[in-house]
């Protein structure tokens, strides 16, 4: 008889839940709920389990916020809870709450070739560190290493490192944004809101007044090629994405590959392919040759957060991935 576990991927707006076959890792019965419609994450879990008439003992839910102890307070939502209390209330034997990019990193060993698009470099080196990052509402970062037949995710808040400009144009962006918001992290330019910041800074650098545009507006105008400011912003976004990925590669020697997740890049895939992304990735001066062969992959799997939550839980329960 198939034994299932609950897996989840929770962001600031939606909670996506599914079942994971503990033996195979297969994800099924995925459903998305609006976080605004429920008073707590526990309430969403109860609704899901009732709707699917399934009893589970184990669960792993990825959440887009730092996980530093038993108490979890979501960054972009009012939900806050004790992991131990939620586990007890649900009657689970095992419940893990992990960072969303911990889950994405743990999905990488489970991905197939059709889930990936490669951008330059050669073949990944088995046993070497892996980096994963992705722009969405924010900028998530994690690393992954393989030790003693186990995959170990190294989460953190790498999206909040300093934005490090490496051209006159990027330095201008930093100067304008710093005057507005003070500390300028990488996330301030590599995210949905970050794309807006890039557009606004480009327009303001020419002593003009920027329009009140959303990330979607900027992307659409850039792709339609009817707004030079939007096209510059999107082009710069791609280059800075490359620079940041190259920084991750240098920091950990990620010859196992650098992976891009998140919902933004797939929206302008053809533009991204033709952009200065790979040039930015390899623009490392004396260490250009060091990163030249490191492959970069875009993850195009529909639910890497759910897949990775399942992988994390299965490994915790003793399965070898």
Curated annotation (Swiss-Prot):
Record-level Gene Ontology MF annotations: ATP binding; D-glucose binding; glucokinase activity
Record-given protein name: Glucokinase
GO cellular component: cytosol
Catalysed reactions listed for this entry: D-glucose + ATP = D-glucose 6-phosphate + ADP + H(+)
Subcellular location: Cytoplasm
Family listed: Belongs to the bacterial glucokinase family.
Binding site for ATP: 8-13
EC number(s) reported in the record: 2.7.1.2
Signal peptide: none
GO process terms (BP): glycolytic process
Chief site of localization: cytoplasm
